[in-house]
């Protein structure tokens, strides 16, 4: 009987440890996606000039389709 209780306790500890590692991996994936988004925004700011853009989505209007401060694409 004691062996069964010990086995159940060990199983519970292993399951909770696995859940903790899964949560850690999930957070790491979220952090990586957030970093990629931040890197993309930094690249956009580097490639795209600061100007008042009449376009509805200023993120799409970058230096290669910008003419005299207005989006052409």
From Swiss-Prot:
Excised during maturation, the propeptide residues are 20-44
Entry's Gene Ontology molecular function annotations: ion channel inhibitor activity; toxin activity
- Where does the UniProt entry say this protein principally localizes? secreted
- Taken from the UniProt record, the cysteine pairs bridged by disulfide bonds within this chain are 48-62, 55-66, 61-71
Function field = Inhibits voltage-gated ion channels.
Q: Which family does it belong to?
A: Belongs to the conotoxin O2 superfamily.
Protein's UniProt name: Conotoxin Vc6.17
Q: What is the originating organism of this protein? A: Conus victoriae (Queen Victoria cone)
